[in-house]
Amino acid sequence: MSRPQRISVLGATGSIGLSTLDVVQRHPDRYEAFALTGFSRLAELEALCLRHRPVYAVVPEQAAAIALQGSLAAAGIRTRVLFGEQALCEVASAPEVDMVMAAIVGAAGLPSTLAAVEAGKRVLLANKEALVMSGALFMQAVKRSGAVLLPIDSEHNAIFQSLPRNYADGLERVGVRRILLTASGGPFRETPLEQLASVTPEQACAHPNWSMGRKISVDSASMMNKGLELIEACWLFDAQPSQVEVVIHPQSVIHSMVDYVDGSVIAQLGNPDMRTPISYAMAWPERIESGVAPLDMFAVGRLDFQRPDEQRFPCLRLARQAAETGGSAPAMLNAANEVAVAAFLERHIRFSDIAVIIEDVLNREAVTAVESLDQVLAADRRARSVAGQWLTRYAG
């Protein structure tokens, strides 16, 4: 019998990381944790190390590494604790690693995800910002290295399942008319427009269907999450923005659809549980038990659809514009959004200010070509600086 596949889980203490480790634990004959990384939830990371006994753990700073190393050694765990961004890249690209779950949220996850790609790993991509920021560079690296890139976002995983195996030959060539990217509409889908300025972080984080981290929950509430996913879909499936249509589907049962030229629409359905796309990507092209309950269509009862209202969700409009503009625009969109969402979560700005800040950054910063990672990161820094200036002027 072959040895278990070794997986590095980047962002192990987040919701995606925990779901990944749940699947790992269900299949000890198939998978084992090689490295687990965490950022701020270090007590949770220690507990995960005690349970999964990885070869490596990675934390942000040396002091935290020394403390965690001591705790694990006292418990008889031989995990070696590393620290810093370079260590993240090392555990993502180590020769012993078979697959990498890239689940660090935001721009911080880009270098390690790219390191896994350049090392030719099977990369389970949950960090959508990596593709949003550096789409062309990222996909070129995939082709150059021979990495296997499998999407973890439920929507992109659904699209991947609904496309033919040879979709890389070109969407038109395989008969695809358009990709239908579904969205729940978040907690504010029916909130009166005049009330959106006064919603709280707690309300924004109360997603009706999915359990997610705070930043992604706010992105879902503003539908920036769907805007980032639109950009990601364009890169993953070599689609034009005009070929990707966003559809609000409140039940979150249909995770996305592919519309073909013969009139067929193929969809992937399932309960809203990230273990489904995670297990599919881990085992692809096979399928394995994930722990997700079967979908009860009789309990679902009905499936509703509606067009997104761009007045209610201006972030979706801004993301589509950035996708159409290209160059550094998506990286700046993402950076401005990260700054704005953090400020909202800290109660420095209103929910409605998030889109205002992003639009201000996109209007003030010139779009440039991005031909290297340094240029991507420079665009990211410029956008963060401009967004910070807005906060100083209006929220200081």
Curated annotation (Swiss-Prot):
Residues at which Mn(2+) binds: D153, E155, E229
UniProt keywords, alphabetically: Isoprene biosynthesis, Manganese, Metal-binding, NADP, Oxidoreductase
One annotated GO molecular function: NADPH binding
Pathway: Isoprenoid biosynthesis; isopentenyl diphosphate biosynthesis via DXP pathway; isopentenyl diphosphate from 1-deoxy-D-xylulose 5-phosphate: step 1/6
Binding site for 1-deoxy-D-xylulose 5-phosphate: K128, S154, E155, S184, H207, S220, N225, K226, E229
Cofactors (names): Mg(2+); Mn(2+)
SUPFAM superfamilies xref list: 1-deoxy-D-xylulose-5-phosphate reductoisomerase, C-terminal domain (SSF69055), Glyceraldehyde-3-phosphate dehydrogenase-like, C-terminal domain (SSF55347), NAD(P)-binding Rossmann-fold domains (SSF51735)
Protein family per UniProt: Belongs to the DXR family.
Record-given protein name: 1-deoxy-D-xylulose 5-phosphate reductoisomerase
